[in-house]
UniProtKB/Swiss-Prot annotation:
Key word Lipid metabolism present: no
Taxonomic classification: Eukaryota, Metazoa, Chordata, Craniata, Vertebrata
Leader sequence residues: none
Pfam families noted in UniProt: Sybindin (PF04099)
Job description of the protein: Core component of the TRAPP complexes which has a function of guanine nucleotide exchange factor activity for Rab1 GTPase. Plays a role in vesicular transport from endoplasmic reticulum to Golgi and autophagy. May play a role in dendrite postsynaptic membrane trafficking.
Coiled coil: none
Listed GO CC annotations: dendrite; endoplasmic reticulum; Golgi membrane; Golgi stack; postsynaptic density membrane; presynaptic active zone; synaptic vesicle; TRAPP complex
GO biological process: autophagy; dendrite development; endoplasmic reticulum to Golgi vesicle-mediated transport
Name of the featured protein: Trafficking protein particle complex subunit 4
Assembly: Component of the multisubunit TRAPP (transport protein particle) complex, which includes at least TRAPPC2, TRAPPC2L, TRAPPC3, TRAPPC3L, TRAPPC4, TRAPPC5, TRAPPC8, TRAPPC9, TRAPPC10, TRAPPC11 and TRAPPC12. Interacts with SDC2.
UniProt-listed SUPFAM superfamilies: SNARE-like
Localization per record: Postsynaptic cell membrane; Golgi apparatus membrane; Endoplasmic reticulum; Vesicle
PANTHER family the UniProt entry points to: TRAFFICKING PROTEIN PARTICLE COMPLEX SUBUNIT, TRAFFICKING PROTEIN PARTICLE COMPLEX SUBUNIT 4
Amino acid sequence: MAIFSVYVVNKAGGLIYQLDSYAPRAEAEKTFSYPLDLLLKLHDERVLVAFGQRDGIRVGHAVLAINGVDVNGKYTADGKEVLEYLGNPANYPVSIRFGRPRLTSNEKLMLASMFHSLFAIGSQLSPEQGSSGIEMLETDTFKLHCFQTLTGIKFVVLADPRQAGIDSLLRKIYEIYSDFALKNPFYSLEMPIRCELFDQNLKLALEVAEKAGTFGPGS
């Protein structure tokens, strides 16, 4: 069981909080000698495989780590430029980990805005008045669950399809938001949530839900 991500979207469709609670699965990790037999290119500030699909490495996969050091965009965590580093024969042999590209901050903002629009469309298309909008979307690999408050704040959780008790978890997150964001004198409504106690209690709630496989009353 797993809870993948949490999003909080304000009533205008702006993303005010986002948390990824899992490490993306690496599709492939391989040690290479020089010259590299893959064609890599820079796209949207990420280093992607453009040609040379093999051994589980696919076109479109991003470079996630080099020699165990995480890659953020086009740089490693220790400040090395990825394409420049891989173009130097002195750095070989080199171990490269590949996987699906991680979403950038801008992409997350855009997706939150798109979901806000889809939510509104769903409410308008309903044959019944007072529709609650989108509450759940299901795919083969995850389910998206949404809870909208009376004030228009949306709490969105992406979870494993087998994860139970998400409705209770969404209300628990709302409770944490009320206790540790709204009651924080330094927090302004509709603005990004940057409250340490909110972070801590949200992560604790996710851990409890994942370990139990559910999140029932009294948790």
